[in-house]
């Protein structure tokens, strides 16, 4: 059984208040996109934009990409997932992952320990709770005593795992319904997807800078790369992908506290690999390479203000293909 090709978008959009997203979501549906995938870091939470979309756009599939396994209690997470399943029957998918030590530990004061087991345990708990079981269990990373959901759901939604390296990628295929990947090139997809297994959904957040101004691309792209690829989980990911030698000067400068030197150490061709940019046709062709290499659900994230993001949405619409 092959996984259908879908057309997602990352939401919410920078510079657009949540209450103003209705017309954006309605246009996204009209343009032929199939999915909205929310991000959660230092802005909106992952669920609220999707709850709004559930009411505003009854045709769109809604997914979190991703919810950290650490930052909500087990029961609270199950209740939130169940609420989304009821709000958008047959249209909700849960993306869950470790997140990073920055978000979990530095921002939320929670120990970032045993990430693989934490995600695995959370998936197992959610499957039991959403099935209506009364859960009492000593998991490896947390314990639950006597919890039963007070609302019924008619289905367990697809659960996808944010994954970078082989262990978590295999977990995504073994205990999840697929993987959510990001910060990788189109060619990197070929190294990642086989670890998940066959007939699994692969959602990719792909960063898109909708301009052919090379100077702007280098300026914005290098700063985005420096901000992410110095986070330990992403540094380890790119070392595994074979970029250790390329990125070592950036890592060394960052560790020394020289942010300017770290940014300057990023090669231009790495920006070209990790940030999709160019003319509308060049962007479309680059995004198509991700799909050709195994991504079933691209979810472009536009690194742009509202006007440029709206323009890019229209230029890259599935209805234009």
Label the model's feature ranges.
Residues 1-321:
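Active-site-adjacent structural elements that line small-molecule/cofactor binding pockets in enzymes
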